[in-house]
Amino acid sequence: MIVVLVDPRRPALVPVDAVEFLTGDVQYTEEMPVKVPWSLPSARPAYDGEDAPVLLSSDPEHPVVKARLAAGDRLIAAPEPQPGERLVDAVALMDKLRTSGPWESEQTHDSLRRYLLEETYELFDAVRSGNADELREELGDVLLQVLFHARIAEDAPHHPFSIDDVADALVRKLGNRVPAVLAGESISLDEQLAQWEERKAQEKKVKARASSMDDVPTGQPALALAQKVLARVSQAGLPAELIPASLTSVSVSADTDSENELRTAVLEFMDTVREVEAAVAAGRRGEDVPEELDVAPLGVISEDEWRAYWPGAESSASEAEPEE
């Protein structure tokens, strides 16, 4: 006498050890999808007649299942769920909402931006609070945003992608960034960090930026944006004296919109950096090569080049010339 327990999420997937026993007299519990018993030649309901040699079910708490196991029936069960299997359910749920929900079906990447920002802040607060229940809930809310945006992307007329593409990109990135760790090699913290930065730099060479300001997310809070931009221009070799004080000194008062003022200053500074980088590239290119045919990477800009092409440099130089 045998009890076969299948995964309730995939009831049609039968454990391989049970296949040989399903060709004869089989009973099934009522929650099983009708297509499963229909595919078995001699299947009948659990309460129909005497006990069959095999009982097929997806419910370990079903009275008949519990009774037969208590009587000593052999159990053949589906493998235990692997970590991440509930993510499959979450993906399916998001697909149902996107296709059937009046609100979900109308959303776009842009319309969800404020929710993504709000949920990120709430997750930050949950981390700070140390409350495990809040952290679990807020992680779920952020996961919802990831699933939602990925599902919206499936409907895009140009360059669509799915949640599997998102996961694949992450797996590829991590596989490239920390191959030693994933290969099981012994590696120190410093070695791992060095490998991460080295691999990251290699990726950037393949995907060369036209500007040091490329890929800076401007939707982040103004202070975080300013810090990111300052880090970028520092890496790009911009002399410190060219950074305006409006980016490094923030005044906060009740009657000023400090967030908006700082953001405006940072965005204007980013535009200036891009303009100077373009001017440097044009100066190096010369007049004989059209801009659209110039595929050479910008490379390193020296401090002298930054100063020479920075707005106001010519007027400053003329003011500094001694009178004859």
UniProtKB/Swiss-Prot annotation:
Q: Which UniProt keywords apply?
A: ATP-binding, Hydrolase, Magnesium, Metal-binding, Nucleotide-binding
Question: Does the record's keyword annotation contain Nucleotide-binding?
Answer: yes
Null allele outcome, as annotated, is: Cells lacking this gene show are defective in response to oxidative stress. Complementation with mazG restores resistance to oxidative stress.
GO molecular function per UniProt = ATP binding; ATP diphosphatase activity; metal ion binding
Name what induces it: By oxidative stress.
Outcome of mutating residue 222 to E: Pyrophosphohydrolase activity is reduced 30-fold
User: Sorted alphabetically, which Pfam families does this protein's record hold?
Assistant: MazG
- In the UniProt record, does the keyword Nucleotide-binding occur? yes
Q: Which reactions is this enzyme annotated as catalysing? A: ATP + H2O = AMP + diphosphate + H(+)
Top EC class of this enzyme: hydrolase
Q: How does it assemble?
A: Homotetramer.
What family does this belong to? Answer: Belongs to the nucleoside triphosphate pyrophosphohydrolase family.
Could you tell me what this protein is called?
Nucleoside triphosphate pyrophosphohydrolase
Its source organism is Mycolicibacterium smegmatis (strain ATCC 700084 / mc(2)155)
